Amino acid sequence: GVRIFSRTWKKDFESLFSRDLGSFYYIKKGGAGMIQDIAPMKFHNEYQQRECRDKDIVFLFSGNKLLVKKDSKISFFYIKEFSKELIKETEQEADGFGNKRLQYLFSIDDVQYYLLNVWTKEEAEKEVEKQLDEQVNRQSKKQNHNIGNMEWVTIRSLRETVSKKDCFAAATAYHLYVWYRDNRYCGRCGKELQPDTKERMMRCACCGNMVYPKIAPAVIVGVIYDNKILMTKYSDREYKKYALIAGFTEIGETAEETVRREVMEEVGLKVKDIVYYKSQPWGFDSNLLMGFYARVEGTDAITLDKNELSLAEWVPREQVAGMNDKISLTREMMENFYQNGEKCLQ
């Protein structure tokens, strides 16, 4: 049998979402929460055309790296810290796609976040040179806009170096950057795509094709047996810490079917009593993650898929303490199992 909600579903729904004039923000009552749990700050993701201001934030990506300020701590760039040339170019159509140099992404409270429309490593390096030149000019004129030491950092490294709010903002901006970067031309006719003026969508003026942001559904599974949880480690990824069974939902497949298939493929186990826990936006990989717990049906003997995993082992509940990073759904599910044991399956 499949239970869609836990017995605390009423509390879950009450605590998950609040909507106001088309915006939403995630509210979590109690607990440290995950990357998106930034209340009382409000996240507004509705698509709008907005004018940038000095206090707003601008992101410059190059592949999987983000340009940051790095002095005593890592921080992001304000609009006022970027070159005057950039600000001027926001007032006109500056590239062959009819796009302005700055693309509005979203806001958190009253701060707006923008993407600098740069798609290649060479373009990104030129922008950095511009900012260095601008910094020298400011210092010579004794203007108090020193942008500090610029550095490229991988987007995933921000999980351990910035606040939860900043990590969420950067991951969500990266999600949109990847989508804009990868959808400059129409996949149907090959013509240039133009950003729509009313919604977040790229439109082809030639054939009418409409391209929306990519969101890939995936599951995280806490497999439980005899008050133990199945912990894994990936075989071919940079991330080397403990994880849970995870995988993408395939065409024509429900999330619950994904749970059964992924567990069988990766560790050779059958599961039952599948219980939904929570979901999480995960901009690092353009995912919407859905968390489930499931009980082993039959034997607990593991058959490891070595192409996917380097390790899979049963870990007793008392040994799962202290694994919550207050960022990821996976880590919160580990902490939830430590706190509640097999009650997670109720």
Residue ranges and their predicted role:
Residues 1, 13-33:
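Short, Lys/Arg-enriched N-terminal segments with co-localized hydrophobic residues
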Residues 172-222:
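Cys/His-rich short segments
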Residues 201-244, 270-271, 294-296:
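N-terminal strand-loop-strand
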Residues 243-278, 292:
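The catalytic Nudix box helix
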Residues 280-302:
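Active-site-adjacent beta-strand/loop module that shapes the phosphate/pyrophosphate-binding cleft
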